[in-house]
């Protein structure tokens, strides 16, 4: 597996007044989640040789994630100031410079995943697009929209960047909030149809407490969310996306374009992802489950 995108440190301000720091970033969380689930993962990212960079490196190494490029493309490791509300939901303010040094192409990945800011924030996003264009076809491309309006906005230029990446993806995941922010003129079903029209074989939408849906040429499959006590929502979507990829890999469905998948398998894949995300939200910070916790 190859994951491409941002690493950062979440500086978390809790409703109680407590301040804590966790290594993370959408793409870093996906890489760590995949590695904890037992998948060999290489990660193309950027972080600096500073205190926060050391936190990121330790986070990746502890899970067994290997770097696919020299991360020293930036002078200061990115941070996200996350404020946690009483309901556990997080809002963010970012300090982020995104650049990417040359990425090792070997060993050839069966899947390439990109997401969030790394897929749309210049100048690094151009390198991500080049990489996806080169590897798609031989590798399954998965894309988690994970919009961050606080840093990118939701104007036509941002929507165009998201759509440019979606055109290269076999599977696109987005939350209902992502779809509403980027395409406010469309209802949820219309936004899903729009993404599928761009070329994605599958569009997965997570809807918080209302569960998740998988839409393809075969129709729509919906599963319920898992009820847990929420510590916070940091890393929940990242974990869900990683577990989707893990479940597809477990069934030998990665490597090239996604073909038709039966509803029974889709339910298993979505429930696996929901179970992983439920574990993550049950504990503070982006702390995805290990394989043994998924039993």
Predicted segments, located by residue:
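Positively charged, low-complexity intrinsically disordered leader regions
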Residues: 1-15
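Active-site metal-binding loops of divalent metal-dependent hydrolases
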Residues: 7, 145, 239
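Conserved N-terminal subdomain of the carbohydrate kinase-like
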Residues: 11, 39-121, 141
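Short catalytic helix/loop segments, enriched in acidic residues and glycine
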Residues: 17-34
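Alpha-helix C-terminal capping segments
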Residues: 31-40, 247-249
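Structural alpha-helical scaffold elements that stabilize or flank donor/cofactor-binding regions
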Residues: 104-106, 164-165, 196
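Conserved beta-alpha-beta core of the PfkB/ribokinase-like small-molecule kinase fold
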Residues: 111-193, 210-211
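Conserved phosphate-binding/catalytic region of the ribokinase-like
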Residues: 134, 184-295
